[in-house]
């Protein structure tokens, strides 16, 4: 919802009429790093350093959700090469993971202030 507000503030959605924007909001869940407080999160976070445990199941579920959104657009006649995904923080991490695991060729991925989750599962 916060990114939609930014796009609306700068009239991006209105001036780019040939572009369809989809702004999914992460589900509400407890985030361990924030003392279990419930908030929007694509997956649980346990720590900020590279050695912190990762919520593999949550990351894979969120990545699948994004890939399902991509597939919906392809099913609606949009070539995957015209689909770009992106996100900020956990959303960026989800977008990166989805982009690297999708079977589709994408136009690109925009990942801001983020990291690659499950990085050890990818080739160097």
Q: What do these predicted ranges mean?
A:
Residues 79, 105-106:
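Short loop/turn motifs at secondary-structure junctions
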Residues 108-124:
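The feature captures the conserved acid-bearing segment of alpha/beta-hydrolase catalytic domains
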Residues 6, 98-99:
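Hydrophobic residues on the short alpha-helix immediately C-terminal to a glycine-rich phosphate/catalytic loop
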Residues 1-82:
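Serine-hydrolase catalytic machinery in alpha/beta-hydrolase-like enzymes
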Residues 84-87, 110-112:
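Short beta-strand immediately N-terminal to the catalytic nucleophile in serine-hydrolase-like folds
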Residues 28, 90, 116:
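Short, glycine/serine-rich, charged loops/turns that create anion-binding
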Residues 86-91, 95:
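Gly/Ala-rich beta-loop-alpha elbow adjacent to hydrolase catalytic centers
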Residues 94-98, 120:
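Hydrolases whose catalytic domains are alpha/beta-hydrolase-1, hotdog thioesterase
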């Amino acid at each position: 919802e916060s990114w939609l507000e930014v796009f609306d503030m700068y009239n991006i959605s209105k001036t780019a009429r040939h572009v369809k924007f989809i702004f999914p909001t992460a589900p509400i869940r407890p985030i361990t790093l924030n003392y279990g407080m419930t908030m929007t999160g694509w997956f649980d976070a346990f720590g900020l350093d590279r050695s912190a445990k990762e919520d593999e199941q949550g990351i894979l579920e969120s990545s699948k959700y994004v890939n399902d959104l991509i597939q919906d657009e392809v099913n609606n006649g949009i070539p995957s090469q015209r689909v770009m995904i992106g996100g900020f923080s956990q959303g960026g991490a989800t977008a990166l993971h989805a982009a690297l695991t999708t079977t589709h060729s994408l136009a690109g991925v925009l990942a801001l202030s983020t990291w690659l989750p499950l990085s050890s599962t990818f080739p160097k």
